């Protein structure tokens, strides 16, 4: 492709850029890092995205799948679908740190969010919560609220689902931190 053709191709596309104000929440904890990680894990179910897909395929209908998800979700109503231990990753660099990122969600909540906002809001699913030790050795639990991310859509249904997610995230963070 010649440079002029590339420019023409780019210009013929439409791009929308939307600003939003993120709300990043950090809870300080007196718990040791390992205890906060253990406590947050105790609140969540655990299944990979592959396992969730297999369960959906094997279910006779969405109702049957929903029953399985309610059982799997744990007390927090979240399923831990992936975990990234930044401490282990960075040990190879070597940068010493204690930090675990949990990728969490619930297909039933995702369905509500996607029904209300369409496929574009799927960009924000699943969500994340992190437990880490700061430079002073204090345990922190951090997450980004969903409500501010959904606010630019001006959709009351979307706002309601995002508010429920934010409440569940706050409860989960509180269980890990306190």
Residue spans for each PLM region:
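Feature detects long, helix-prone N-terminal segments enriched in hydrophobes
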Residues: 2-178
